[in-house]
């Protein structure tokens, strides 16, 4: 794994790529990169939102790199990635929310990597259906949009996002024939029943894949961890989710 990790790191630096693995200070970077998988972040390294859990810099986004779609596609090719995950910062400063750039990136990846399956982890595009349509048109295998937390904590955790808007986005994508996925962070002060309710809400929006993980504080400035959720509780969540999905 270490050799592959070093090789990937060199490639990312040489191509000046933004991976959320690095900028988000993900603790599992060695494991994923060692296995030859990575998540690419497009649209720059500065986010227009300031979610309390995330280590990505906040500010006015920089100019889009028109060569980025090609660079990402080329890197996936060089790395031999079989399943690529692409995400982006929120670009509320752009008229189209970055959706054109997103579509170009997916098209470019397809062109250079016809056998690679694609997962796009998208922002909410402020619920703008025209922007969501651009993602639908390029038809990634999976479209992810993370709800992140339960409704009660949503305002505190993801300040400029809205719980109901995220559900709307997921339902809109599902109704358009997309395979949708969402993620929840646990250990932020939510109750078990609130997680169950969120799973029910996601299911009602047509979501077919949900990931649940432990929230980890990336720096002391970020939202504190309320609790480390016991593996048995995660098992309860898994079983509940599987029952909901029947």
Segments the model singles out, each with a brief description of its role:
Residues 1-39, 70, 104-115, 130, ...:
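Auxiliary Fe-S-binding modules of radical SAM enzymes
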Residues 18-57, 72-78, 82-85:
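N-terminal pre-triad scaffold of radical SAM enzymes
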Residues 36, 50-52, 96, 130, ...:
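Short acidic, gly/pro-rich beta-turn/loop elements at beta-sheet edges
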Residues 45-48, 81, 148-150, 215-217:
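Short connector loops/turns at beta-strand edges and beta->alpha or beta->beta junctions
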Residues 56-71, 78-129, 135-168, 181-185, ...:
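Core AdoMet radical
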């Amino acid at each position: 794994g270490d050799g592959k990790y070093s090789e990937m790191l060199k490639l990312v630096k040489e191509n000046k790529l933004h991976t959320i693995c690095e900028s988000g200070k993900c603790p599992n970077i060695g494991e994923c990169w060692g296995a030859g998988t990575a998540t690419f972040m497009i649209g720059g390294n500065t986010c227009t939102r300031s979610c309390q859990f995330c280590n990505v810099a906040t500010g006015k986004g920089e100019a889009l790199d028109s060569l980025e779609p090609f660079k990402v596609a080329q890197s996936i090719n060089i790395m031999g990635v079989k399943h690529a995950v692409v995400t982006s910062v929120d670009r509320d400063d752009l008229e189209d929310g970055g959706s054109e750039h997103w579509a170009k990136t997916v098209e470019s990846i397809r062109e250079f990597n016809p056998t690679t399956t694609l997962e796009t982890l998208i922002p909410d595009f402020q619920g703008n259906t025209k922007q969501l349509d651009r993602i639908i048109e390029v038809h990634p295998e999976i479209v992810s949009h993370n709800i992140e937390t339960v409704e009660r904590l949503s305002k505190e955790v993801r300040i400029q996002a809205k719980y109901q808007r995220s559900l709307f986005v997921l339902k809109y994508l599902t109704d358009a024939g997309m395979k949708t996925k969402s993620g929840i962070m646990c250990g932020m002060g939510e109750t078990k029943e609130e997680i169950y309710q969120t799973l029910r809400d996601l299911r009602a929006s047509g979501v077919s894949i949900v990931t649940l993980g432990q929230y980890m504080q990336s720096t002391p400035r970020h939202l504190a961890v309320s609790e480390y959720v016991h593996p048995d509780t995660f098992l309860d969540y898994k079983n509940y989710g599987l029952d909901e999905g029947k």
